[in-house]
């Protein structure tokens, strides 16, 4: 029954995304990223022949991937590349690595010096920046038609600008809520009945805040990332959506409304009461959660990997729930995706990239990822019924959230806008600025970025 419910939920997600694609809005112009003649591929890329092309001469491709530096992900990615090389001995994959917060600038700076990578693993929200930098190429020009056609159409559309897809997600997730069942029990709360609204969360927060760990450390009731990294801005956008608010309209214009203001008021309320750790990155919240110092927090589903890497016993106390509803909102959330973006560096590289991406996106490798690294929802239609997902106790509590999504309008300055949202959150928390002044300052800065 659980498998059927999760499969149905996934289908509903796709139906929902039909009505709210993320591919609209202002977009950067994709510069010509092509060049070079074929050096060793005996078939064209961009079609079904791409993956079947025989690589007759050695070719090296550069794969930018921040995750190989992170515990819990490194073993998987290194193992995957070893298996790929065994099957494709003429293809050498050269890793380009940098910490999460630095990888995009590393890629762009390399390109400025004439050294372009061939494929990038990262966040869906990086697409506007990479397109604007003239790096990300249309996936249909590089990857196989079979693979591209298997991605849920509206997920592919959510990775598009001006109707052109620039990425294929390995997996997707909304921002969901993780909570600690053990801490709920210690506070006299029902571990099987997490809050569904921000008001309900605030009602139980004092009981959770009264707890301490065995070594006397404070327990925070609720975590919302506000540190100055782009993914924190995406999470804050999701919080605005929880309240029925808007950041950008469909045309990419700033659209501050009451739901936006209600969300910012909540960020301040959480801080005023000491409920949310100040200026925390997601990795900081994962650490606190793993150590029993955080009762609830927002994260992508794959944040579980960071938690379990710190505390292997986390599976015994972690549970998921849908994002909270606030104000007049319905608890809508932002779609997140671990995404592969490609660069057109000529036919030989394209053929090799097509093979690598197809290997990464294979059922074998995705199943291994979901089993050994972290649960998430596959973006391929052919994998809708994967048992490893249908039977996941980690995803079960938040299953309904994937049918309650609101997409983000892509603009070239999206990453910068996300950072300004972090500045806004820090203003009403760390700096103690009043909400009206902080929002006014945000509007001024955001308009400067968008214009």
Predicted regions and their residues:
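Conserved N-terminal structural module of periplasmic/extracytoplasmic solute-binding proteins
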Residues: 6, 20-129, 148, 191, ...
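Hinge/lid segment of periplasmic solute-binding proteins
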Residues: 40-54, 99, 122-176, 202, ...
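Extracytoplasmic/periplasmic substrate-recognition and gating elements
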Residues: 59, 82, 86-87, 92, ...
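Short helix-initiation/N-cap motifs at beta->coil->alpha
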Residues: 97-106, 125, 196-202, 277-291
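Alpha-to-beta junction loops
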Residues: 111-122, 135-136, 291-299
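Periplasmic solute-binding protein
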Residues: 128-135, 155-193, 224-249, 329, ...
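Long, aromatic- and glycine/proline-rich binding clefts that accommodate carbohydrate-like moieties
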Residues: 158, 321-322, 370-423, 427
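Glycine-centered hinge/linker elements that transmit conformational signals in sensory
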Residues: 204-207, 250-279
């Amino acid at each position: 029954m659980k498998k059927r419910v999760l499969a149905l939920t996934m289908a509903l997600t796709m139906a929902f995304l039909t009505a709210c694609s993320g591919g609209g809005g202002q977009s950067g112009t994709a510069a010509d990223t092509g060049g070079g003649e074929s050096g060793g591929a005996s078939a064209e890329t961009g079609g079904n022949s791409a993956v079947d092309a025989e690589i007759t001469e050695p070719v090296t491709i550069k794969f930018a991937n921040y995750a190989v530096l992170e515990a819990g992900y490194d073993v998987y990615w290194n193992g995957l590349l070893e298996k790929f090389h065994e099957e494709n001995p003429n293809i050498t994959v050269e890793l380009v690595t940098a910490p999460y917060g630095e990888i995009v600038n590393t890629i762009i700076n390399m390109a400025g010096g004439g050294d372009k990578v061939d494929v990038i693993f990262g966040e869906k929200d990086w697409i506007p920046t990479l397109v604007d930098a003239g790096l990300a190429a249309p996936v249909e020009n590089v990857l196989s038609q079979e693979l591209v056609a298997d991605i849920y159409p509206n997920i592919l559309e959510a990775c598009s600008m001006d109707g052109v897809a620039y990425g294929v997600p390995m997996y997707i997730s909304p921002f969901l809520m993780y909570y600690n069942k053990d801490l709920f029990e210690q506070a006299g709360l029902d571990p099987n009945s997490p809050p569904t609204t921000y008001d309900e969360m605030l009602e139980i927060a004092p009981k959770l805040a009264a707890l301490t760990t065995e070594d006397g450390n404070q327990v925070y009731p609720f975590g919302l990332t506000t540190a100055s990294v782009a993914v924190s801005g995406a999470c804050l956008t999701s919080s605005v959506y929880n309240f029925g608010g808007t950041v950008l309209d469909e045309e990419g214009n700033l659209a501050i409304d009451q739901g936006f203001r209600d969300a910012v008021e909540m960020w301040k309320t959480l801080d005023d009461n000491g409920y949310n750790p100040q200026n925390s990155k997601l990795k900081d919240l994962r650490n606190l959660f793993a150590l029993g110092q955080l009762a609830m927090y927002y994260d992508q589903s794959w944040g579980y990997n960071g938690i379990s890497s710190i505390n292997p016993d986390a599976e015994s106390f972690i549970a998921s729930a849908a994002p909270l509803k606030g104000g007049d909102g319905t608890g809508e959330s932002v779609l997140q995706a671990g995404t592969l973006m490609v660069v057109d560096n000529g036919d030989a590289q394209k053929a090799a990239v097509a093979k690598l991406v197809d290997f990464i996106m294979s059922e074998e490798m995705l199943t291994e990822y979901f089993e050994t690294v972290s649960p998430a929802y596959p973006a391929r239609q052919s994998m809708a019924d994967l048992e490893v997902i249908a039977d996941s106790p980690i995803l079960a509590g938040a299953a309904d959230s994937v049918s309650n999504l609101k997409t983000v309008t892509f603009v070239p300055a999206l990453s910068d806008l996300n950072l300004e949202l972090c500045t806004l959150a820090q203003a009403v928390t760390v700096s103690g600025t009043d909400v009206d002044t902080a929002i006014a300052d945000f509007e001024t800065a955001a308009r400067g970025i968008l214009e």
